[in-house]
Amino acid sequence: MTVVESGKPTPMKAMKVTKPYAPALPELTPAQELALLARCLFSEGYDDHLAGHITHKQPDGTFLVNPFGLTWDELRASDVMRMDADGNELDGPWTITPAITLHVELHKARHDVGVAIHNHSRWGTIWADIGRAPEVYDQTSALYHGEVAVYDEYWGAVDDPRNAQSAVKAMGDANVALLANHGVLVLAGDIEQAYLRAMSFEWRCRQAWHVAAAGGGTPMNREAARNYGDFFNTHQFTGLFEAMARRELRRDPTILD
């Protein structure tokens, strides 16, 4: 088969929308947003049993966080915990994991981060174990085309502040990181962007593995992938998180309780 180059990629233009894409979600509280994000990401492969934590920065400087002991596919808004900037529990019915230290250090160093996600996702953890970032082979993988940091000095846990600080330093300005022999870390400004980046990166990890298993392939043109990712980083992917949230609410209407 001959692959024909179509010329130099050109930047995408925003679509003009004159009516809604689909039914709107009800007005959500921050805790409801976090619960929906956890459910959506569980469906995408962020599903390692009790592992994983999501922090959602609030205007008053506190953070919402999922509790330890509940899987992401059973989390409801009423389960969501609140902690201060040092990781101390302020409110909620359950317990906050000691491993939240990584998020505490991240938020102290990166004031641009509104949402931080850590889990041992099914496909991302494979590449964390390999110790390198996968190539981008398709458009969905390119929805996040920023830097992927690889932190390869894993000491067995990140609940020690020194280890967490080392991971944050190694990450720099990247918004996605592979923690070698551990898992994935995704940072974003808000809930919708967090879902987009986490979903896209897990998709990328899965597709790259399948392409390699099939004998290899040609990665997406880097400039085209960058244009595509930059566009959706700027304009968001209107309706994406809402559609996936509606899917989860169809499965379990009690998420917002």
Regions inferred by a protein language model and the residue ranges of each:
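Glycine-rich flexible loops
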Residues: 2-257
